[in-house]
Amino acid sequence: LNLYECQGVVDVSALGGVHTLKLSDCRGVVDVSALGGVHTLDLSRCAGVVDVSALGGVHTLNLSWCRGVVDVSALGGVHTLNLFGCRGVVDVSALGGVHTLDLSHCRGVVDVSALGGVHTLRLSHCAGVVDVSALGGVHTLDLSRACVQV
């Protein structure tokens, strides 16, 4: 179900059974607690989304540019997680089990030592990350435009 840029969409509580749901740029969406059963969920640029604690069961989750998102501790079970531009995110220690993780432009992220189990990790434009020595187990690592000590 694609509801891209549907500004009138506010209540998504009845959409928890949908397999693939695109709510990108639906700025009226705030409460996503009923969407934990969605397989593939795109909430990119949903400015009102803050609490993502119920989304740990989502397989593929796009939260890019959701600047209100701060606490991602419940998302360790997500397979593919996009946090591109989530500048409020600081603590990523619970995300070591994520298979593919994009933290590009997450300026608050400094400590990535718990992410050694991630298969594919993007840290592009993460100037706060200076030590990647614990990431030896990462298969694909993107450090473009990041000042790090390798």
What are these regions (language model features)?
Residues 1-10, 17-30, 37-50, 57-69, ...:
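Concave beta-strand-loop units of leucine-rich repeat
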